[in-house]
Amino acid sequence: MSKKAVPPIVKAQYELYNRKLNRAIKVSGSQKKLDASFVGFSESSNPETGKPHADMSMSAKVKRVNTWLKNFDREYWDNQFASKPIPRPAKQVLKGSSSKSQQRDEGEVVFTRKDSQKSVRTVSYWVCTPEKSMKPLKYKEDENVVEVTFNDLAAQKAGDKLVSILLEINVVGGAVDDKGRVAVLEKDAAVTVDYLLGSPYEAINLVSGLNKINFRSMTDVVDSIPSLLNERKVCVFQNDDSSSFYIRKWANFLQEVSAVLPVGTGKSSTIVLT
């Protein structure tokens, strides 16, 4: 890739901004025809004061046009860019949590069941793929966006709860500073640069070296990876085709381990250490 060439991500950002700008100008014109006193959108100056905007950077311009569309063209914004409300299921309770629990080191919790004199320990563990080394992230010919799937991360046994997902991306080489992005897209969204840059969810900028991106749910634990991602998909955009991306995927699970307490039918005494 030539250093003088406009990176695809920069080009896509400008195209997306111009699409929003044209929409704001069009709506402003329509509203002024209905109401001459309507204050329309202006890219270069504050229409209320007439003074030029102090900050004309791309990020500032995007923020201004986004705010205007949210306030004056809400239906368009909601249809094109707004995120859907994230379901907030009730906080899940592990078996035995009705009794008093005691916090232990390294996040372990022990639940005591008085009826059966058993304890349930919740043990945290990680699984990863690939296990020994990272693997190259492969793209289709003439494409620079790829969806990352996590169906190869499996729990040790059915019923284990999922806490989080960790995606490691090692970026090697490249002619430009802007290496790429990691973004979350809706399930039905096309895996393209335009959809990735227009995603209403936070996008993570990638830098040279090792990047670690964590994905967690609104709740403490969930039953599966699709539940954690809320049926959405994770995509990686490579901005510079002269760089190489290597990935490894991790998943953190919780597992319940039962144990019978050493309680007999004979005399029982307790010594309290102070």
UniProtKB/Swiss-Prot annotation:
InterPro entries: RBDV_coat. Pfam families: RBDV_coat. GO terms for cellular component: viral capsid. It is found in: Virion. It comes from the Viruses. The keyword Disulfide bond does not apply. Residues 88-113 are annotated as: Disordered. The keyword Membrane does not apply. Keywords: Capsid protein, Virion. Disulfide bonds: none annotated. Residues 102-113 have a biased composition (Basic and acidic residues). Capsid protein self-assembles to form a capsid about 33 nm in diameter. The capsid encapsulates two genomic RNAs as well as a third, subgenomic RNA (RNA3) (Potential). This is Capsid protein. It comes from Raspberry bushy dwarf virus (isolate Malling Jewel raspberry/R15).
